[in-house]
């Protein structure tokens, strides 16, 4: 059973985008603080009424977000 739900964050021209790697969830926001709120809400709504065990997750999984940065070279 997985204990984390993985999310990749990328930066667009105007917004940050969070894409869940484990579920079909995508959201965006103008700030990282708002993005954190949005991704929690989107994942919560996606999982509503679902069995976490059937999806391969342990009870109360955490969200692990990784931010993709532009190359420095």
Give residue spans per PLM region.
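Short, charged, surface-exposed hinge/linker loops at domain edges
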Residues: 1-8, 33-73
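Structural detector for hydrophobic anchor residues on beta-strands
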Residues: 5, 16, 25-27
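Short aromatic-glycine-(Arg/Gly/Cys) micro-motifs in beta-strand/loop hairpins
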Residues: 8-20
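Short acidic, gly/pro-rich beta-turn/loop elements at beta-sheet edges
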Residues: 17-19, 28, 37
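A short, exposed loop/beta-hairpin motif centered on an aromatic-Gly-Thr core
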Residues: 23-33
């Amino acid at each position: 059973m997985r204990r984390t739900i993985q999310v990749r964050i990328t930066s667009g021209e105007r917004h940050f985008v969070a894409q869940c790697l484990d579920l079909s969830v995508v959201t965006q926001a103008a700030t990282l603080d708002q993005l954190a709120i949005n991704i929690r809400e989107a994942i919560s709504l996606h999982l509503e009424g679902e069995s976490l065990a059937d999806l391969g997750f342990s009870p109360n999984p955490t969200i692990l977000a990784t931010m993709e940065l532009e190359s420095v070279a």
